[in-house]
Each structure stands twice: as structure tokens, then as C-alpha cells.
Design a protein with these regions (language model features):
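N-terminal intrinsically disordered/low-complexity leader segments
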Residues: 1-22
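Helix-turn-helix
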Residues: 26, 30, 34-68, 72
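Short, basic, alpha-helical segments at the C-terminal edge of helix-turn-helix-like DNA-binding modules
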Residues: 45, 74-81
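Residues in the recognition helix of alpha-helical DNA-binding motifs
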Residues: 62, 72-73, 155, 204
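Hydrophobic alpha-helical connector segments
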Residues: 66, 72, 83-118, 175
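Amphipathic alpha-helical packing segments from all-alpha helical-bundle domains
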Residues: 114-128, 135-162, 172-176, 207-214
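Hydrophobic/aromatic-rich alpha-helical bundle segments in the mid-to-C-terminal region
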Residues: 160-208
Length: 216
């Protein structure tokens, strides 16, 4: 009897975890749609629960607060998954920092900028706007910007170590250029407001970085 109970619990546990993860994804997707359509302030937790098709209590149990929900949404959209792995520990970034081809490094950085912004650009815009009135989100935005610059500084330092930076460009100024060209605000202006395609944005970032950082 005891063995059967233990076996059933062991069998059900992964299933319950997957169900919980699926519910979490549904809530995040619903929140993203409503935040993008109506804005952070005008979106209520009951509206998110209704959009996700779950009980309001479920939303609060999963995320605590609306700010906590947006925080979780930002983390997932930035990383592309729900694994708590920093960018600096992700395989694509570690491989980037060990590359010896500066042109490939710059092109990969441009490609990754496109992929990340397509996934997270709108959510980052919402976080930045909400940070004006939400202290917890202001802290989140500061953390995002700090980590973002650190990631780009790693790329600049690698180019510097390869001796590939153009005359007059050091690691600090290279970081400034990477920061400006890859910033979510730049993506938003060009893609969302000016109507650029993702291909055009990626090409422009890559070509501009090559010209400004490598002098080619």
C-alpha cells in the first residue's frame, strides 16, 4: 500500500510541475498581451487572470504582485526561457568571448541584439515606463541596464584584447558605442516607430558596429 502511494506521488510530481509551469506561461502570456495593449497602469490583476483563464488567487500565488509579474515576464523575455542563467554564463556569450574573428564577433552581437529585442523589446519598454512610479520596477530597470552594459563591455574588451579596435577607440568608448546601438530604446525607435524590418535593424547594427569599432 505504502509503495503504491509513493509510486503514485513520484509519478504525479513531474506532471504537477509541468502543469504549474504551463499555468505560469499562460499567465505571463496574458499579462504581456494586456500590458502591450493597455499599458501597465491600466492593466489589473483580475483582467490578467481572466485573460489567462485562471483564478485570481492563482495569479497572486504565482507572482505576488503586478510588479512581481512584470519582473518575471521581463526575466523570461530577456533570457528566452525560464532558466535562472545569467547572460554571461550562457553558451552563445561564452563562445563569443572566446572567438578570434572580430567581424564574426560583431555580426553575432548584431544578430543577438535583434533576437533579444524581438523577444523582449516591447516588455522592456513597459518596464521602463512603469519604473517611473514603481520602486521595485525602477530597481529592476537599473539592474537590467547594469547587466546589459556589463555584457557589452565583455564584447568590447574581447575586441580590445584581439587588437581589433579602430585607432582612437578604446574598450570604454567601444562599450559606449555597443551600448547605444544595441540599447532597447534604439531598437524601439527604429523598429516600432520608424517601421524598420528586423533584417534592416540587424544589418544596420552590424555595419555600424563594424565601421565604428573596427574601422572597416
Amino acid at each position: 500500500m505504502t509503495a503504491r502511494v509513493k509510486s503514485r506521488r513520484g509519478y504525479d510530481s513531474p506532471r504537477r510541475r509541468e502543469q504549474a509551469a504551463e499555468t505560469r506561461r499562460k499567465i505571463l502570456g496574458a499579462a504581456e498581451r494586456l500590458f502591450c495593449e493597455h499599458g501597465y497602469a491600466a492593466t489589473s490583476m483580475p483582467a490578467i487572470a481572466a485573460q489567462a483563464g485562471v483564478a485570481l488567487k492563482t495569479v497572486y500565488l504565482a507572482f505576488g504582485t503586478k510588479a512581481g509579474l512584470l519582473h518575471a515576464l521581463g526575466d523570461v523575455r530577456l533570457s528566452g526561457d525560464d532558466q535562472p542563467i545569467p547572460v554571461t554564463d550562457r553558451p552563445w556569450y561564452r563562445q563569443l568571448l572566446h572567438g578570434d574573428d572580430p567581424q564574426l564577433l560583431v555580426r553575432t552581437a548584431a544578430r543577438q541584439s535583434r533576437v533579444t529585442k524581438e523577444r523582449s523589446g516591447d516588455v522592456l519598454r513597459i518596464i521602463r515606463q512603469a519604473a517611473v512610479t514603481e520602486p521595485a520596477l525602477a530597481e529592476l530597470w537599473d539592474r537590467i541596464e547594469t547587466e546589459f552594459r556589463a555584457v557589452l563591455a565583455g564584447i568590447a574588451e574581447r575586441l580590445d584584447a584581439l587588437g581589433s579596435l579602430a585607432p582612437g577607440v578604446d574598450a570604454t568608448s567601444a562599450t559606449d558605442l555597443l551600448w547605444t546601438l544595441n540599447h532597447p530604446d534604439t531598437w524601439y525607435l527604429l523598429v516600432r516607430q520608424c517601421g524598420w524590418t528586423a533584417d534592416r535593424y540587424e544589418q544596420w547594427v552590424g555595419e555600424t558596429l563594424s565601421a565604428q569599432l573596427l574601422g572597416v
